[in-house]
């Protein structure tokens, strides 16, 4: 079973993603801050198939988490954010995100 790390400080969104992905057959771990995500990634750096990453997080930002992930390898990262400007999208994708989904989103947008 593939494991997905959900990094989202909004409890409702985090739980919604976890529920939908679990029903689709994925194993999920949740982080509610950039600091927590970084800790989990350091403990389990090769066990995740994908990271769903919010940009606006308490503590360490999503951008910093993405930078840390890219230093270690090619773990796929899909950014989920309320930041919807073209400049922000280009910046994040250039920094190494594999996809960029703007909130609010439909759950089907993150199903793969």
Predicted segments with their positions:
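N-terminal/domain-start alpha-helical segments
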Residues: 1-112
């Amino acid at each position: 079973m593939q494991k997905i790390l959900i990094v989202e400080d909004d409890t409702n969104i985090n739980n919604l993603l976890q529920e939908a992905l679990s029903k689709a057959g994925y194993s999920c771990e949740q982080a509610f801050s950039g600091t927590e995500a970084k800790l989990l990634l350091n403990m389990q750096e090769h066990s995740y198939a994908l990271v769903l990453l919010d940009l606006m997080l308490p503590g360490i930002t999503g951008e910093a988490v993405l930078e840390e992930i890219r230093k270690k390898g090619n773990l796929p990262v899909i950014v989920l954010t309320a930041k919807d400007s073209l400049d922000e999208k280009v910046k994040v994708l250039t920094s190494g995100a594999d996809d960029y989904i703007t909130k609010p989103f439909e759950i089907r947008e993150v199903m793969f």
